[in-house]
């Protein structure tokens, strides 16, 4: 009985360690249609604490970059896409903190390109101190089933998204605009 109990405790401890391996967790991503056709991307983040050996304080994570990648089908028969990317930096988060990050597509772009509220593909990359965290399932669309497709999507968004550079905007660039 003791061996069985020890096995269960070890299994639970390993499971908990695997769940908390990333310092910043992407909990949820939502897309919302706003006034005047603006589109909002909401990313909910949680801080799990600093796993770095030489961390100044294990309860604080610093220099967090959040990069959003969106892909909308432009022409299905030609398999062409419009890509939008943008990133922000969060200075610091404390263990247990939840933070929401917002990105926006202007209504005139959404209207002109007839974009749906939810993109065909999306991914949110989180980096801490310049090091990208492992991809998290909650950080990507269900159309991205494996790392090969994810890497291809990121590569294409980076190389083919120049036409839409700065179109997807972080929340601090749309302050003062009444989005309802």
Regions found by a protein language model. Name each.
Residues 52-54, 109-121:
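Short glycine/proline/serine/threonine-rich loop/turn segments at secondary-structure transition edges
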Residues 56-89, 120-129:
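Extended low-complexity, serine/threonine- and proline-enriched intrinsically disordered segments
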Residues 32-54, 59-65, 103:
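Contiguous beta-strand segments within globular domains
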Residues 84-94, 107, 123-180:
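Short beta-strand elements
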Residues 44-47, 101-115:
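Short, hydrophobic beta-strand segments
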Residues 18-20:
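Boundary at the C-terminal end of the N-terminal hydrophobic targeting segment
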Residues 4-14:
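Sec-dependent N-terminal signal peptides
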Residues 24-34:
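Short amphipathic beta-strand and strand-loop transition segments with alternating hydrophobic
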């Amino acid at each position: 009985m003791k061996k069985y109990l020890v096995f269960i405790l070890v299994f639970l401890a390993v499971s908990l360690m695997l769940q908390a391996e990333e310092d910043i967790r992407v909990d949820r991503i939502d897309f919302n249609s706003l006034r005047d056709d603006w589109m909002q991307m909401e990313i909910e983040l949680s801080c799990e604490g600093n796993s770095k050996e030489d961390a100044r304080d294990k309860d604080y994570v610093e220099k967090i970059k959040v990069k959003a990648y969106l892909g909308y089908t432009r022409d299905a028969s030609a398999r062409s896409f419009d890509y939008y990317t943008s990133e922000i930096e969060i200075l610091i988060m404390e263990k247990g903190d939840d933070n929401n990050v917002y990105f926006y597509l202007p209504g005139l772009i959404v209207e002109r390109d007839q974009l749906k509220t939810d993109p065909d593909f999306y991914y949110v990359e989180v980096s801490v101190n310049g090091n990208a965290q492992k991809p998290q399932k909650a950080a990507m669309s269900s159309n991205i089933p494996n790392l090969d497709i994810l890497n291809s999507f990121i590569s294409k968004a980076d190389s083919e998204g120049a036409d839409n550079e700065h179109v997807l905007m972080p929340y601090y660039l749309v302050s003062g605009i009444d989005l309802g």
